[in-house]
Amino acid sequence: MKTAFFILLIFSIFYGKAKGAEDREGFPVNRFGCTYPCYYGEDTEKCRRLCRETLGADYGYCFWYACYCENLPENVRRIKSQGFFGCSNGWWVVSTTTRKPK
């Protein structure tokens, strides 16, 4: 009985942490509400730099032709799922990212 309770407790802790991390990931958007386009290959490194160095996330990569970040700070604007974005999918400038003032 103690073993079952212990396993349930461990599962609950890991599920809670994973659930919380999911809430802080997504496609970051700039001040115009546009995602940062990428085309795999060398742009994957651009996404990593955007997510980690500029936005303060733990990790970033190119996913469905847009940069996707994991463990973003709560003050970074993002969208959760990909769709039709209504922004041009051209080259982007990292300086167009906005953050809420501290």
UniProtKB/Swiss-Prot annotation:
Tissue: Expressed by the venom gland.
Annotated SMART domains: Knot1
UniProt cross-references to InterPro entries, sorted A to Z: LCN-type_CS_alpha_beta_dom, Scorpion_toxin-like, Scorpion_toxin-like_sf, Scorpion_toxinL, Scorpion_toxinL/defensin
Domain remarks: Has the structural arrangement of an alpha-helix connected to antiparallel beta-sheets by disulfide bonds (CS-alpha/beta).
Highest taxon of source: Eukaryota
Disulfide bonds listed in the record: 34-87, 38-62, 47-67, 51-69
The entry's keywords: Disulfide bond, Ion channel impairing toxin, Neurotoxin, Secreted, Signal, Toxin, Voltage-gated sodium channel impairing toxin
Organism whose genome encodes this protein: Tityus serrulatus
Job description of the protein: Putative sodium channel toxin.
Family to which the UniProt record says this protein belongs: Belongs to the long (4 C-C) scorpion toxin superfamily. Sodium channel inhibitor family.
Pfam families from the UniProt entry: Toxin_3
One GO CC term on file: extracellular region
Intracellular or extracellular location(s): Secreted
An example Gene Ontology molecular-function term: toxin activity
CDD domains in alphabetical order: neurotoxins_LC_scorpion
BP-aspect Gene Ontology terms: defense response
Annotated LCN-type CS-alpha/beta domain residues: 24-102
Protein name: Putative sodium channel toxin Ts33
Signal peptide (UniProt feature, chain positions): 1-20
